[in-house]
Amino acid sequence: MATLRVQPEAQAKVDVFREDLCTKTENLLGSYFPKKISELDAFLKEPALNEANLSNLKAPLDIPVPDPVKEKEKGERKKQQEKEDKDEKKKGEDEDKGPPCGPVNCNEKILVLLQRLKPEIKDVIEQLNLVTTWLQLQIPRIEDGNNFGVAVQEKVFELMTSLHTKLEGFHTQISKYFSERGDAVTKAAKQPHVGDYRQLVHELDEAEYRDIRLMVMEIRNAYAVLYDIILKNFEKLKKPRGETKGMIY
C-alpha cells in the first residue's frame, strides 16, 4: 500500500495551523457572524439607504449648454480652418483636447456609500474563504459507506462556492458603474446640447444607489445563511462519519 511519509515536525506545523484555523472559524460563527448580521441590518435601516425620492441623489453637472448661434459660427470657422490646415498632427492634437468645461466630480452621495460598502465586501469574502477552508479540513478520508455526512459537507461547500462567486462580482459591478458613468459624462461634455446624455448620468447614479442597497442586503444574507446552515448541520460538518477523521492525503 502506497503511503506518503511526512516528517513529524512538518505534521506538527500543519496540525497547529489546522487547530488555529478551526478555533478562529468557530469564534467567527459563534460571535462575529451574528454581530455582522446585526450591523448590516442596522445599515439597511439608515436614512442614507432609504431615500424615497431618488431625484435627491442628482449630482450637479458643471457642463454649460452652448448658445446655438455661437456654436454654428464656431462650427463654420472650424470647417474653414480644417480646409486651410492640412497638418494631420495638429488636427490630432485638437481632437485630443478636453471638453470646454471644468472638472466633473463623482456623485458624492454614491461615493460615500461605496466607501462604506467596499470594506464590507472585502471582509465577507475573507471570512467566507476562512470558513470554506475550515469545511474542507473536516472532509474525511474517501471510503465506501456512511457518506451521508460527507454529502452534507458537499452541499454546504456548493453553497459557499455560489456565495463567493456572487460576492466577487460586486467589485466588477462597482468598477463598471464608474466606467459607464465616465463614458456618459464624456458624451454629455462633448455634446452638451443633447439632454439624453445628461439624464443618462443621473439614471446611472440612481441605478447604482439601488444596487448598493441590494449588495448590502446580499452581504447580510450571506452571513445569515452561512450561520444558519452551519449551525443546523454543525455536527455533520464537524464529524461527518460520527467520529474525527484525518485530512485527505
From Swiss-Prot:
The lineage of its organism: Eukaryota, Metazoa, Chordata, Craniata, Vertebrata. This is Proteasome activator complex subunit 1. One of its GO terms (biological process) is regulation of G1/S transition of mitotic cell cycle. Residues 68-98 have a biased composition (Basic and acidic residues). Heterodimer of PSME1 and PSME2, which forms a hexameric ring. PSME1 can form homoheptamers. Pfam families: PA28_C, PA28_N. Residues 60-101 are annotated as: Disordered. Implicated in immunoproteasome assembly and required for efficient antigen processing. The PA28 activator complex enhances the generation of class I binding peptides by altering the cleavage pattern of the proteasome. Belongs to the PA28 family.
